[in-house]
From Swiss-Prot:
Molecular function in Gene Ontology: oxidoreductase activity
EC number: 1.3.1.-
Superkingdom of this protein's organism: Eukaryota
Keyword Transferase applies: no
Enzymatic class: oxidoreductase
Gene name linked to the record: swnN
Pathway entry: Mycotoxin biosynthesis
Protein name, as recorded: Oxidoreductase swnN
Keyword entries, A-Z: NADP, Oxidoreductase
Length: 318
């Protein structure tokens, strides 16, 4: 069994399901030698980075981690923190995170002893039902497109853009499979695409999965019909012009997120980047679909997930 090190694995997208409690090490990400020794002494073979590349300091930490892995003599596989879109795709009006991701890719190319893959996931499905989570999640609370609590949606343009949605547990399952795959079979670009839709499809999915059952008696034909009446969410389509100006209708649940004095500005920048990336069709994701390599993985169906989230909301109502 391979020894795997997860950098940043105590929160966010990096928490795997494991039968045994993993060992934890506090390391100085500015000290390549220290990290190299920790990796070597523990015979680590695979490094999975779950660092949130939110600024230059964290991006530099991942660069140092790559160098430590390359110098360890034990690490042969590396998965950088990507888990979103192809950062080579141009997104007019936003370069948020782009340089950090490309710098990591360039650093990996300098170390031929490492096998690596860039994993594209799109938007995490986890965001769509928060704070009602049908499956375990460690994703930071933040709302994208749908606010199930306040029954509202905000979509970009006409909503016709391609969208990939996968749950964080789907990503974890595929990473576990990749760890066991021989290095020569690793794709350079990997795709986790549990659900492929257009953004505007979310409106119909919401209506379909928030249905409440009611009976209707047909007097003439003497039949009893069970109808599902879906909830009508408030839906806003932000215009292309507004998005390009950074004027995006905030989902109600995001308002306190944006008001946070430490992270609010970053999340507002993320919101703009997500909407601009949708307009440029950057979510038409490339890569080898891991569902083809690992058909045994049971991924999260968006319809089932939304329905379960809605049912949790109904059950938690006072």
């Amino acid at each position: 069994m391979a020894v795997v090190a997860v950098a940043g694995g105590t929160g966010g997208k990096g928490v795997p399901g494991a039968a045994n409690e993993p060992r934890r090490y506090a390391v100085d990400y500015d000290n390549v030698e220290e990290m190299r020794n920790v990796l070597k002494e523990n015979n680590v073979e695979v490094v999975v980075s779950a660092l949130l590349l939110s600024d230059e300091s964290v991006a530099k930490s991942q660069i140092n981690l790559i160098r430590a892995a390359a110098e360890s003599g034990t690490v042969t596989k590396f998965i950088p923190s990507e888990y979103y879109i192809d950062f080579h795709s141009p997104i007019p009006g936003s370069d948020l995170f782009t340089n950090f991701q490309i710098e990591a890719e360039e650093e990996l190319m300098r170390h031929p002893q490492l096998t690596w893959t860039l994993i594209r996931v799109g938007i995490f499905l986890d965001h769509l039902t928060m704070p009602f989570n049908p499956k375990p999640t460690y994703i930071t609370p933040y709302w994208v497109f749908v606010d199930i609590e306040h029954e509202e949606c905000v979509f970009p343009g006409d909503g016709s853009q391609p969208l990939v949605l996968s749950h964080s547990t789907d990503l974890a399952a595929y990473i576990e499979c990749l760890v066991g795959l021989p290095s020569n079979e690793w794709p350079r670009e990997s795709l986790v695409a549990s659900n492929k839709i257009q953004v505007k499809d979310l409106q119909d999915l919401i209506k379909k999965t928030t249905g409440t059952l009611c009976g209707h008696l047909g007097i003439c034909i003497r039949t009893f019909l069970i109808l599902a009446i879906g909830r009508e969410f408030k839906v806003t389509y932000d215009s292309v012009e507004s998005i390009q100006k950074g004027q995006i209708t905030p989902l109600t649940s995001n308002r306190p997120v944006f008001d946070d004095p430490q992270k609010g500005k970053l999340f507002q920048e993320v919101e703009v980047q997500v909407m601009l990336s949708m307009l440029s069709n950057a979510h038409d994701l490339p890569g080898k679909n891991l569902a083809e390599l690992f058909p045994e993985v049971h991924v999260t169906n968006i319809e089932d997930f939304l329905r379960a989230g809605w049912e949790m909301k109904q059950g938690l109502k006072p």
